[in-house]
């Protein structure tokens, strides 16, 4: 699996192509899986497949907010989201995995629409998350890596592996 640094070396267009595939890959992975399999955690620390799907959906909401804000503001700061708190607050284990994938798909389409509208200068615009500075260019590498990471986690969870 490529690292964030590997993705950062790729052209932005290649990173976005990777991101375009994620909704279909996630839908294919959960298709035909029982609720018991989707909700099964491989161990006490790791998420079930449906939790991975919900996390990707909600992370996309965060990425979309960044992509809407950064072109319009000078170096905005965003808090670092606590994924486990969000998972508990939004009751991921009670969510419908297919619905989470459908919502992720909708949000991802909007995110990709926003990225296609960015100018070369806007890709260089900076912001921070939890005090860590980055650019929209770096965000695209993070998104591609994040997709790979959590798709792999989702697939392992379906197999009952951590």
Residue ranges and their predicted role:
Residues 2-4, 39-83, 112, 124-162:
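Short, contiguous alpha-helical
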Residues 36-41, 96-100:
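Short helix-to-loop capping/linker segments positioned immediately adjacent to catalytic or ligand/cofactor-binding
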Residues 18-29, 86-124:
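Acidic/histidine-rich alpha-helical segments that form the ligand environment
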Residues 10-13, 96-101, 137:
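Active-site rim elements
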């Amino acid at each position: 699996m490529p690292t964030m640094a590997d993705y950062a070396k790729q052209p932005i267009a290649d990173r976005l192509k990777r991101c375009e595939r994620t909704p279909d890959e996630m839908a294919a992975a959960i298709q035909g899986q029982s609720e018991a399999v989707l909700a099964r955690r491989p161990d006490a620390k790791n998420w079930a497949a449906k939790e991975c799907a919900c996390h990707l959906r909600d992370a996309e909401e965060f990425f979309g907010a960044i992509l809407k804000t950064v072109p319009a503001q000078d170096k905005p700061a965003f808090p670092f989201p606590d994924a486990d708190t969000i998972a508990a607050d939004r009751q991921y284990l009670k969510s419908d995995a297919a619905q989470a994938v459908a919502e992720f798909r909708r949000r991802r389409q909007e995110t990709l629409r926003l990225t296609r509208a960015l100018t070369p200068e806007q890709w260089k615009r900076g912001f921070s998350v939890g005090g860590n500075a980055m650019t929209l260019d770096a965000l695209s590498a993070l998104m591609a890596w994040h997709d790979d990471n959590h798709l792999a986690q989702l697939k392992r969870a379906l197999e009952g592996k951590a």
